[in-house]
């Protein structure tokens, strides 16, 4: 009962934020860009939480079981990636005064390339966000809600409805403030869980830091094995490209950054939260090491699936009801701060990029409701499929859609050529399919399994395809 009361109180606070930020008549400009009046430090803090999904909240502590703390190598790459986004991409987005970042493709490559880029974003974001939210719903159902008799078919509609309720008026303006609150809740829950684990281990903070540093799972850097996926340079470069593509070329991740008052403030915002990812993920990984120590101390067998490490202790009640409540708040805060911005970004892209009716408020309201409804249907469909392998395949295939976005933007930025718009959608469809075939064949016949480097190959194939198709004689718009 305490969990239900806590979560309801949490949602009441979100609805209060929504009411306060949308008291005056909220226009489409407010919904899409918050009238470009957002304080950069609020955006920066909220973006840390928005970038950490509920899956991340659960998965990162479990990573130490198999790969120690080597994930921090990728987080170091994130820093360079965010600097590149801040000083290469943001100036372009602000120069063109864009509502959605895909408007740049319209300026540079024409209408069809513009629609293609936006369509790939919509496909990837809707499916990817639904899969992530589905996994979080399953975790909450399995470890918390089943125990108090709440069925899955009630959980999903209620959670999606609540997201729609607090975003329907203020949109991105509301999210700047709610994401700040949710990030605060997430880190408060994380730190309090760490304190509870230290208490169970009988350690002071300084003793815990020493124990973590001396533990075999505290390994961060891998320089000596070039074949390992955890090799520093592979992880570092992957971190750079992941940020450029999955943040810099993603309307969901960039929309709040475009609400800052000026380019300079937006750059401060992006660089600030770029640095924050190293200490943030260090906390998650440190929790993972402490949980492994606790399992050894209590003689508890570690789970076969690393993602179950935190839920095994935090949601099972082994460490008390307080930790269960904290775990619930943490995972809800992390998942909501990701899902709410995804639904807002999808609505924005649909109205502005696909339908071309930026000023139509009635359409925007209908599209926002429709997006929430389709999002709910996707989650229920994943539950009906009830096959981990099928859902994983869907998620992997949708992740391939970021490659064409990388290729489209790289071609636009690095060349002054125009393309034959008739063929650009086919190039963007062919590149992920070729990558999927290459990945399957190399895995089957060579034994090599691509990681994040497949994203770079995908982008390179798209770039090459765009270079091959017939140029149009349209003057490049400076």
Per-segment meaning from a language model:
Residues 1-57, 167-170, 183, 189, ...:
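Membrane-interface "cap" regions at the ends of multi-pass membrane proteins
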Residues 7-18, 82-86, 121, 138, ...:
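Hydrophobic core segments of alpha-helical transmembrane domains in multi-pass membrane transport
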Residues 13-28, 88-102, 162-165, 169-172, ...:
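Juxtamembrane interface elements at the cytosolic ends of transmembrane helices
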Residues 16-24, 126-133, 137-154, 165-168, ...:
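Hydrophobic alpha-helical segments and their helix-loop junctions in multi-pass secondary transporters
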Residues 27-44, 152, 396-467, 475-477:
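C-terminal membrane-solvent junction of multi-pass transporters and transport-like membrane proteins
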Residues 38-47, 108-117, 182-195, 275, ...:
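Small-residue-rich segments of transmembrane alpha-helices in multi-pass membrane proteins
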Residues 62, 66-169, 257-396:
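Helix-loop-helix junctions that connect adjacent transmembrane helices in secondary transporters/permeases
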């Amino acid at each position: 009962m305490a969990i239900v009361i806590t979560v309801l109180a949490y949602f009441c606070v979100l609805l209060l934020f929504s009411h306060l930020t949308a008291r005056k008549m909220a226009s489409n400009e407010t919904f899409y860009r918050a009238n470009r009046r957002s304080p950069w430090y609020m955006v920066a803090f909220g973006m840390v939480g928005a970038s950490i999904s509920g899956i991340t909240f659960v998965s990162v502590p479990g990573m130490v079981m198999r790969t120690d703390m080597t994930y921090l190598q990728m987080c170091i790459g994130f820093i360079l990636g965010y600097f590149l986004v801040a000083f290469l991409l943001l100036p372009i987005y602000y120069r063109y005064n864009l509502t959605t970042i895909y408007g740049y493709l319209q300026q540079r490559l024409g209408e069809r390339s513009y629609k293609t880029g936006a369509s790939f974003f919509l496909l990837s974001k809707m499916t990817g966000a639904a899969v992530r939210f589905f996994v979080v719903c399953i975790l909450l159902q399995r470890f918390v809600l089943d125990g108090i008799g709440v069925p899955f078919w009630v959980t999903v509609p209620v959670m999606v409805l609540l997201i729609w309720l607090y975003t329907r008026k203020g949109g991105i303006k509301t999210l700047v403030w709610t994401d700040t609150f949710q990030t605060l809740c997430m880190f408060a829950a994380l730190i309090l869980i760490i304190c509870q684990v230290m208490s169970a281990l009988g350690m002071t903070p300084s003793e815990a830091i020493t124990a973590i540093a001396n533990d075999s799972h505290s390994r961060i850097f891998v320089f000596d094995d070039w074949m390992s996926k955890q090799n520093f340079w592979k992880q570092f470069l992957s971190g750079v490209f992941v940020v450029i593509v999955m943040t810099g070329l993603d309307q969901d991740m960039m929309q709040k950054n475009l609400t800052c008052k000026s380019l300079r403030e937006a750059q401060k915002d992006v660089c600030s939260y770029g640095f924050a990812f190293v200490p943030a993920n260090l906390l998650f990984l440190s929790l993972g090491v402490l949980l492994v120590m606790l399992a050894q101390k209590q003689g508890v067998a570690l789970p076969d699936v690393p993602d179950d490490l935190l839920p095994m202790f935090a949601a099972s009640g082994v460490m008390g009801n307080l930790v269960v409540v904290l775990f619930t708040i943490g995972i809800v805060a992390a998942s909501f701060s990701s899902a709410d911005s995804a639904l807002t970004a999808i609505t924005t892209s649909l109205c502005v990029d696909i339908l071309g009716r930026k000023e139509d408020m009635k359409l925007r309201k209908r599209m926002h409701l429709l997006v929430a409804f389709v999002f709910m249907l996707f989650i229920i469909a994943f539950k009906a499929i009830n096959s981990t392998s099928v859902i994983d395949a869907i998620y992997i295939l949708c992740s391939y859609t970021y490659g064409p976005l990388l290729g489209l933007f790289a071609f636009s930025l690095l060349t002054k050529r125009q393309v034959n718009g008739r063929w650009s959608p086919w190039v963007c469809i062919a590149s992920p399919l070729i990558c999927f075939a290459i990945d399957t064949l190399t895995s089957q016949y060579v034994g090599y399994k691509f990681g994040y480097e497949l994203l770079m190959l995908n982008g390179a194939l798209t770039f090459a395809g765009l270079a091959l198709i017939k140029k149009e004689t349209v003057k490049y718009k400076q």
